């Protein structure tokens, strides 16, 4: 494509609007298109050329003559979904021809150098740039500049070629790394292997509906991996299992879903899929989770010093755990974080919580370090039984411990005890009160002593506030007092 026509440009705009609408409708994230127009394009062209001291390439003049001197078109995926290319998580197409300029670049010695080859027309959120290469044959070749690598990457030999290619790829960008999977010698290759894979995936993301795939298990799993984000208000993961079980057996679901981890894909997806399976299937996946823990036990046993081998062998023999002797069964992506989360969401608390606590303690012994806040490992249990375990480990800085305390369903007596304890426990409790969900706070005082317990909590907090010296501490204590300021029925 050698020239932008008004008709083709208007078709692109319709495609961009459709892409952003379909993606944002599904993702629940903000996005859309914003265009700025000019009534006197020829005057704007003259002003820009005078300011820059050059004649604009015809492609840029055409864009201004169509009236579109400025545009912002964007979309974003929610966190937590499984995408085929980890760095492609948003779309960001934009330009501002009126204000484009020559960016200052730096030489190998770190000295800024003046240049008039690359004309920046859009900046990504991380500082990466989209630029025109004025020395290219068309004068409007589009390149990406990565601020971290200080590297230029050709995206298309001309502006119309760029629009055509980036439209096929769903407006990905403008972070420099997001283009890398699709680059060839001549820039972006939407019809290359990765480009075709991405286009097929994005088409399904935009168009697939549950009614289309409910009887097709592989397609249903593909859909849920696309839409099961970390945002519980979008597609709650706990609702996926019951939906699948209406049409498929638990055995078939687990077998097919686990097998998807053997397909070529980013390493991160293999790991995240295991967590998704557990959160979706819950207790239906308990036996599978037990096999993962058994495999981990075998791996840990194989890695112990030789001097410990006889003791390990006796323990395994006593437990009758044959699978634990086979470290080859261990999945590399089933790391401690994965196993701890799966224990929380799939196993009974009486079984899963002791497993995780022992694993955390074992790791601390082996490393010789203090236990850091195991928030990710323990928060998912939402168990008050976590609280007495963490008490002896809490220290300054308490960040992480407060989050874990708030997630562990504390009762008023727990908070009172912590507020009467050492400084680290006291300030952790103060911060945790401010982190408690508003709708959970009344449950603190649901018992027969609720009025007396709240009175004591407020007394302790007010005493702390009166003696606090640092403004940060006073603010945190004030927030805790405010959180407890509601009428008891």
Predicted regions and their residues:
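Compact, glycine/acidic-enriched structural inserts
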Residues: 145-177
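Eukaryote-biased recognition of electropositive, low-complexity segments
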Residues: 174-186
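Terminal, low-structured helical/coil segments at or just beyond the last alpha-helical repeat
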Residues: 473-489
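A short alpha->loop->secondary-structure connector
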Residues: 139
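Broad, structure-driven detector of short, well-ordered beta-strand segments within folded domains
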Residues: 128-135
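Extended alpha-helical scaffolding segments
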Residues: 409-414, 418-476
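A surface-exposed partner-binding patch
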Residues: 1-128, 177-180, 196-211, 216-220, ...
């Amino acid at each position: 494509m050698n020239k932008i026509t008004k008709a083709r440009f208007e078709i692109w705009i319709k495609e961009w609007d459709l892409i952003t609408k379909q993606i944002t409708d599904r993702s629940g994230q903000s996005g859309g298109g914003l265009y700025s127009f000019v009534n006197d394009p020829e005057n704007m062209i003259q002003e820009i050329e005078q300011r820059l001291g050059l004649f604009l390439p015809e492609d840029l003049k055409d864009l201004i003559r169509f009236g579109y001197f400025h545009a912002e078109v964007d979309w974003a995926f929610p966190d937590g979904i499984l995408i085929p290319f980890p760095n492609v998580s948003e779309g960001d197409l934009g330009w501002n021809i009126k204000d484009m300029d020559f960016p200052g670049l730096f030489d190998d010695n770190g000295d800024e150098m003046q240049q008039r080859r690359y004309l920046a027309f859009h900046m990504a959120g991380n500082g990466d740039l989209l630029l025109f290469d004025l020395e290219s044959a068309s004068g409007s070749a589009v390149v990406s500049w990565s601020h971290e690598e200080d590297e230029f990457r050709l995206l298309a030999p001309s502006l119309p070629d760029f629009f055509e290619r980036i439209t096929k790829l769903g407006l990905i960008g403008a972070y420099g790394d997001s283009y890398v999977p699709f680059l060839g010698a001549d820039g972006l290759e939407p019809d290359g292997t990765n480009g075709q894979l991405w286009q097929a995936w994005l088409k399904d993301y935009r168009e697939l509906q549950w009614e289309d795939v409910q009887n097709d298990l592989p397609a249903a799993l593909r859909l849920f991996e696309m839409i099961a984000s970390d945002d519980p208000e979008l597609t709650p993961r706990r609702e996926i299992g019951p939906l699948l079980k209406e049409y498929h057996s638990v055995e078939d679901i687990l077998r097919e879903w686990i097998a998807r981890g053997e397909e070529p894909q980013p390493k991160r997806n293999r790991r995240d899929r295991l967590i998704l399976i557990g959160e979706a299937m819950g207790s239906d996946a308990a036996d599978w989770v037990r096999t993962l823990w058994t495999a981990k036990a075998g791996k840990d046993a194989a890695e112990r010093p030789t001097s410990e081998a006889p003791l390990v062998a006796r323990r395994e023999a006593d437990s009758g755990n044959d699978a634990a002797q086979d470290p080859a069964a261990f999945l590399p992506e089933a790391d401690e974080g994965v196993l701890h989360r799966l224990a929380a969401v799939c196993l009974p608390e009486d079984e899963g919580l002791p497993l995780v606590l022992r694993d955390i303690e074992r790791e601390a012994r082996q490393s010789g370090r203090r236990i850091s806040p195991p928030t990710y490992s323990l928060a998912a249990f939402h168990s008050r039984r976590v609280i007495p375990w963490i008490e002896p480990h809490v220290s300054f800085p308490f960040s992480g411990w407060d989050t874990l305390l708030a997630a562990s369903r504390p009762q008023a007596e727990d908070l009172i005890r912590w507020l009467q304890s050492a400084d680290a426990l006291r300030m952790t409790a103060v911060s945790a009160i401010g982190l408690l969900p508003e709708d959970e706070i009344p449950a603190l005082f649901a018992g027969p002593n609720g009025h007396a317990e709240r009175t004591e909590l407020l007394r302790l907090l007010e005493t702390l506030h009166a003696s606090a010296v640092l403004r940060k501490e006073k603010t945190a204590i004030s927030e805790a007092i405010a959180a407890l300021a509601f009428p008891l029925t």
